[in-house]
C-alpha cells in the first residue's frame, strides 16, 4: 500500500491511533535523548488531540521541554499536570522548577508552600523549600526545612553538601555531621 492510499484509507489522518500514540511517544523520547528537541516536539504534535492530555503524553512533553530548557512551555505543561493530578507531588515540584527559571524564585517558593500543605511528608518539597530559603538568605528556615527533608529521606543529607543552592550553609551542615560519604545501612 502506498503512502497516498494509506492516507486515503485513513481519510488523511494516518497518525491518530493508540498504537501510533505509543510509537510517537517512543520516537519523541528517542529524539529527546539525542537532544533533538524540535524533532521530539514534532512527534508529540502529531499525537491525536484526544491523547495529548493523557498523563504519559504530558509527562513526555514536560521532559522534552525541561531538557530543552524551554521553561515557559514546561511551566504550562507542569500546571496542566498539577491541576489534573494534585495528589502527585512531582507535578507541584515540576511547576516550581519551571517557575524558578521562567519567572522568579519567589513564585516557585509560593507553589511549594501550597504543595507542602497537601504533601506534608514529601521530602523533595521540603528540600526545595530549604534551597529557596537559603538562596533568600534565611539560613534558619533553610536548615529547618533541610532537617525535615533528611528526617524523611536520608539521601538529602549527602545532596545538601553538593547543592549550589545550599552553599551558604555548608559550614553549618559540616558542623552538624553532614557528609558526602554514604552512611552504612542500619540493619
Report each predicted region and the residues it spans.
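Canonical positions in the second alpha-helix
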Residues: 13, 46-47, 80-81, 114-115, ...
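Structural signature of tandem alpha-helical TPR/SEL1-like repeats
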Residues: 5-6, 34-42, 68-80, 102-114, ...
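Alpha-helical adaptor scaffolds
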Residues: 56-124
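Alpha-helical segment of the N-proximal tetratricopeptide repeat
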Residues: 17-67, 94
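TPR/TPR-like (Sel1-like) alpha-helical repeat modules
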Residues: 134-158, 181-184
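N-terminal acidic, proline/glycine-rich, low-complexity intrinsically disordered segments
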Residues: 1-11
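TPR/TPR-like alpha-solenoid helical repeat scaffolds
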Residues: 62-67, 97-100, 131-134, 155-178
Amino acid at each position: 500500500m502506498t503512502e497516498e492510499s494509506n492516507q486515503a484509507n485513513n481519510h488523511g489522518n494516518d497518525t491518530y491511533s493508540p498504537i501510533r500514540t505509543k510509537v510517537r511517544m517512543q520516537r519523541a523520547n528517542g529524539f529527546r535523548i539525542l537532544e533533538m528537541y524540535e524533532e521530539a516536539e514534532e512527534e508529540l504534535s502529531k499525537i491525536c488531540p484526544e491523547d495529548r492530555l493523557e498523563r504519559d503524553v504530558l509527562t513526555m512533553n514536560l521532559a522534552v521541554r525541561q531538557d530543552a530548557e524551554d521553561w515557559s512551555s514546561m511551566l504550562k505543561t507542569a500546571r496542566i499536570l498539577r491541576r489534573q493530578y494534585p495528589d502527585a507531588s512531582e507535578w507541584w515540584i515540576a511547576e516550581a522548577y519551571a517557575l524558578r527559571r521562567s519567572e522568579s524564585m519567589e513564585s516557585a517558593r509560593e507553589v511549594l508552600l501550597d504543595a507542602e500543605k497537601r504533601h506534608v511528608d514529601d521530602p523533595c518539597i521540603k528540600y526545595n523549600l530549604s534551597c529557596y530559603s537559603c538562596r533568600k538568605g534565611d539560613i534558619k528556615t533553610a536548615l529547618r526545612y533541610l532537617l525535615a527533608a533528611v528526617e524523611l529521606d536520608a539521601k538529602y543529607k549527602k545532596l545538601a553538601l553538593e547543592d549550589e543552592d545550599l552553599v551558604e550553609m555548608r559550614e553549618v551542615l559540616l558542623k552538624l555531621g553532614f557528609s558526602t560519604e554514604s552512611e552504612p545501612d542500619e540493619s
